[in-house]
Amino acid sequence: MFNLFLTDTVWYVGQIIFIVAVCLMVTITVVAFLASIKLCIQLCGLCNTLVLSPSIYLYDRSKQLYKYYNEEVRPPPLEVDDIIIQTL
């Protein structure tokens, strides 16, 4: 009779350990999945910060510089004599 109760106790303890182990595995899997989703979101934000934002900034800045140098600052036209002197 004593052996039967000890076997039942070990069986219950084994089930408790199994349930705790399964819960830990599920928790670790869910946390890893959520961390990978968070990492993907961070990488997309990093891609936006490092690739798209500088390219948009450079496009806008170069457009401003192009307008500035082509519309506002125009060098005086060279005379024919000045062109000949510069080429010599």
From Swiss-Prot:
Residues in compartment: Intravirion: 38-79
Stretches that traverse the bilayer: 17-37
A Pfam entry, by short name: CoV_E
Keyword field contains Transmembrane: yes
GO CC annotation terms, alphabetical: host cell Golgi membrane; membrane
Membrane topology value: Single-pass type III membrane protein
Domain of life: Viruses
Virion surface side: 1-16
Xref: InterPro entries: E_protein_bCoV, E_protein_CoV
Subcellular location: Host Golgi apparatus membrane
Primary localization class, coarse: host cell
GO biological process, one term: disruption of cellular anatomical structure in another organism
Alphabetical keyword list: Apoptosis, Host Golgi apparatus, Host membrane, Membrane, Transmembrane, Transmembrane helix
Role summary: Plays a central role in virus morphogenesis and assembly. Acts as a viroporin and self-assembles in host membranes forming pentameric protein-lipid pores that allow ion transport. Also plays a role in the induction of apoptosis.
Family designation: Belongs to the betacoronaviruses E protein family.
Quaternary structure annotation from Swiss-Prot or TrEMBL: Homopentamer. Interacts with membrane protein M in the budding compartment of the host cell, which is located between endoplasmic reticulum and the Golgi complex. Interacts with Nucleoprotein.
Name of the molecule in the record: Envelope small membrane protein
Organism the protein comes from: Murine coronavirus (strain S)
Name of the gene encoding the protein in the UniProt record: E
